[in-house]
Swiss-Prot record:
UniProt-listed GO biological process terms: cobalamin biosynthetic process
GO molecular function, one term: catalytic activity
Gene3D superfamilies membership: 3.40.50.880, P-loop containing nucleotide triphosphate hydrolases
UniProt keyword annotation of Secreted present: no
Presence of keyword Endoplasmic reticulum: no
PROSITE patterns linked: GATASE_COBBQ (PS51274)
Pathway: Cofactor biosynthesis; adenosylcobalamin biosynthesis
The protein's name: Cobyric acid synthase
InterPro entries associated with the record: Class_I_gatase-like, CobQ/CobB/MinD/ParA_Nub-bd_dom, CobQ_GATase1, CobQ_N, CobQ_synth, GATase_3, P-loop_NTPase
Length: 484
């Protein structure tokens, strides 16, 4: 059986995902067969695993860090929040059903078996499995039936390292408080802790380390600074949208309206990484900037609900004005569906609204259907005759006159639509901006020249940098026990 360690946090967004990715790369660089695992993830940023089916994009990134094929078993339970129907539940890559919060709590005990079975599959043939928890084990109101943190750790017998985020303040109280409220059996699973996102002179925290050990008895396995490479990794969660830069003075301004159920917004990361692009995320209450040359409508977990919110924010009027000025629009997946004349949902898959008018910027209509398209795809852009690689995760079929001008040929089949004036483009293909040739041609069409970086190589280099920084700042004795 493989060795395993689980990183749990004192809260959400403490940096567990990046630490797991960095440790996976560090172990892989030392020649180990290492695999990531997350029992339960809640995110609308999904990927298509190499063995088919959906997993969180964070686990897809961690598999990339581990230099191992991704699998649905690396994230056996994925919760995708949507509208009034609660969350869609994905189990081992396939749609299991839908449930609201309290109903899901009742489902968790029966999902534990699937989680443990997937963990066994991931561990089979591996030297090391690095597990990521969700939220915090201190949420003791959710401990009964837990599958994400201590419920999994105790059942699988995996020791836990607790991660505290010092940047947000109160890290000593967070760690000591977690120790205080955990049950004895759960507390015994914790072997030590890591301080993450430290700024400044580490020696200034020496007294803090002594205080934490005095209250908890836990050793410190390292004080990790802000990792410079982390900013070059794909965005994982909508929480990070609050921190993404607005502005920067790039020659080309691209605006992205942030809708409540935004999905797969890491599609935008390759554009955000370009130094001559100013990518701005627009929140509710803000106007779409009049000087934006391109507006991108990203994916959505609930097209109809997000379309209503788009109108409530006044962004439909902003979009119409943008197009009248000659501005361009790209809609991806749910964003593509919004650009059409009508969205039909006769089975109520997204809720109670069975039909809603779209923005009518493309002469197409979408009908939602229960069959879900989930696959990795290869394509060629018809606009720029450039190769594309990406993935599809969507419900529904889109048809109409503008589909006669497909935006791409995907897996040998026409996909998407282009308006007659060429200003509006829609596609179901996620990940198109990560295709360097396509991104280069797109930016050239706005007058930007120059050589573009290889986006996938830049992510890979960032993972190596993070692994190097962890090797520098984590306790060498602890690391030796983990990765040899």
């Amino acid at each position: 059986m493989a060795r395993a360690i689980m990183l749990q946090g004192t809260g959400s967004d403490v940096g567990k995902t990046v630490l797991v990715a960095g440790l996976c790369r560090l172990a892989a660089n030392r020649g180990l067969t290492v695999r990531p695992f997350k029992p339960q993830n809640m995110s609308n940023n999904a990927a298509v695993a190499d063995d088919g089916g959906e997993i969180g994009r964070a686990q897809w990134l961690q598999s990339l860090a581990a230099r191992t094929p991704s699998s649905v078993h690396m994230n056996p339970v994925l919760l995708k929040p949507q509208s009034e129907n609660g969350s869609q539940i994905i189990v081992q890559g396939r749609v299991f059903g839908q449930a609201k919060g309290r109903d899901y709590q009742r489902l968790k005990p029966q999902l534990l078996g699937a989680v443990l079975a997937s963990f066994e599959k991931v561990a089979d043939g591996a030297d090391l499995v690095i597990v990521e928890g969700a939220g915090s084990p201190a949420e003791i109101n959710l401990r009964a039936g837990d599958i994400a943190n201590m419920g999994f750790a105790t059942q699988a017998g995996v020791p836990v390292v607790l991660v505290g985020d010092i940047d947000r303040g109160g890290v000593i109280a967070s760690l000591v408080g977690t120790h205080a409220i955990l049950a004895d059996a759960d507390r015994a699973m914790i072997s030590g802790y890591i301080i993450n996102k430290f700024r400044g002179d580490v020696s200034l925290f020496d007294n803090g380390i002594r205080a934490i050990e005095g209250f908890t008895g836990w050793p410190c396995f390292g004080v990790v600074p802000w990792l410079s490479g982390a900013a070059r990794l794909p965005a994982e969660d909508s929480v990070v949208l609050e921190r993404l830069a607005k502005g920067g003075g790039g020659a080309l301004k691209i605006a992205v309206p942030v809708l409540p159920r935004i999905a797969n917004f890491d599609d935008l990361d390759p554009l955000r990484a370009e130094p001559d692009v100013e990518l701005v995320f627009i929140r509710s209450g803000e106007r779409l900037p009049a000087d934006a040359s391109l507006v991108v409508l990203p994916g959505s977990k609930s097209t109809i609900s997000d379309l209503a919110d788009l109108r409530a924010a006044g962004w439909d009027r902003d979009l119409f004005a943008h197009v009248r000025r000659g501005g361009r629009v790209i809609g991806i997946c749910g964003g593509y569906q919004m650009l059409g004349r009508t969205v039909h949902d006769p089975l109520g898959l997204e809720g109670g609204t069975l039909e809603t008018p779209g923005l009518a910027l493309l002469d197409v209509e979408t009908e939602m259907a229960p069959e879900k398209t989930v696959r990795n795809s290869h394509a060629r852009s018809t606009e720029y005759d450039a190769p594309l690689a990406g993935y599809q995760i969507h419900l529904g079929m889109t048809r109409g006159p503008d589909c006669g001008r497909p935006s791409a040929i995907v897996d040998g089949v026409p996909d998407g639509a282009l308006s007659a004036n060429g200003l509006i483009m829609g596609t179901y293909l996620h990940g198109l901006f990560a295709s360097d040739a396509y991104r280069t041609r797109l930016l050239q069409s706005f007058g930007l020249s120059g050589e573009r970086r290889n986006y996938r190589e830049s992510v890979d280099k960032a993972l190596d940098e993070i692994a190097g920084e962890l090797e520098r700042y984590l306790d060498p004795r602890w690391l030796a026990g983990l990765v040899g």
